Amino acid sequence: MTILADLRTRTRGWHPPSRYAGAAYGVVAVLCVAALIVDHRTLEGAPIWAKPLKFAISGSLYFLTWSWLVSLLPRFRRTAGRLTNALVVIFTAEYVLLVFQAARGRASHFNNATPMDATIYQVMAKMIIGLWVATFALTVLVMFTKVTDRASFWAVRAGAVLSLVGISLGILMTSPTAQQLAQWKTGGTPDMVGAHTVGLADGGPGLPILGWSTVAGDLRIPHFVGMHALQVLPLLAIALLALTSRFPRLRDDVVRARLVLVGAAGYAGLIALVTWQSLRAQSIVHPDGLTLSAAAALVAAVGLASWAVVRAPARVAA
């Protein structure tokens, strides 16, 4: 059996529309890479096609994960399928507007420069609300997923909840900055309303492709980290299961479940840490002593908790 045929067999029971959407956005991501190569225009210091590329990759991961999660539901699968269909439609409509603005060399988010730009951003903002509502409903339904492995049981639930938290953190970027408020007070109209950079204006030096500021805080970081808990925690459960042949202690599904819960708590701490760091106008690549101390404490807490779980006495069969 070829790899492609094996993949088709494994994913046959997944929710079809979101599965196809995930695959389609993977192809779109490749096209965005090609666009980056041939179109060297920049916007606010970043390649014009970097944002469509990031959204395509995130969309692919997001829809493939939800396609799998919907297949795990013993009840409400039809409702979850309809909600996931709505996610595909809304996200695709938003993505079309994002690409349209990129092709024009215009910012898609926070753009208030012209009536057309403002209208596009307002429409996208309403779409984001729709995405959040549908994701919230799906997160509630995920609590009914049927998974026999306890580690996966908790990974799916914790991942969905933390992902919703990460999506919600995007609201922090929509508030006007001090400079924008000052411009309003003097009778002006700012071209941009909202920002992802904290402490400086958007458009400064940033990490390649990701674009995260290297000189100030960046609210895209907690948004990204939180949103992808949906993939990280299930992958943790899968990794622990794969290690059972090498580490006999992990053959106990209770041990793996507890390690997943420790990982989920640590991941929640990471989301809080990078949110706090960003709001303090501190770059991800230049943490101060306070941030490093908090990070060290988080790592130590996760490490000690994991050690305690593994070292706890094994269950004795009745």
Language model features: what each stretch is:
Residues A305-A318:
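Membrane-interface capping segments at transmembrane-helix boundaries
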Residues L43-P52, F110-V123, R150-W154, A182-G187, ...:
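Non-cytosolic membrane-interface motifs at loop->transmembrane helix junctions
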Residues A178-A229:
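Membrane-interfacial catalytic/cofactor-binding modules of polytopic membrane enzymes
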Residues M1-W14:
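Short, Lys/Arg-rich, polar N-terminal cytosolic tail immediately upstream
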Residues P17-I37, W49-S71, N85-A103, V123-L138, ...:
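Hydrophobic cores of alpha-helical transmembrane segments in multi-pass integral membrane proteins
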Residues R246-V254, W276-L292:
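Extracellular/periplasmic helix-loop-helix junctions in multi-pass membrane proteins
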Residues L69-T79:
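Membrane-helix interface/capping segments
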Residues T79-L87, F144-S168, A182, V255-G263:
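Interfacial segments of alpha-helical transmembrane regions
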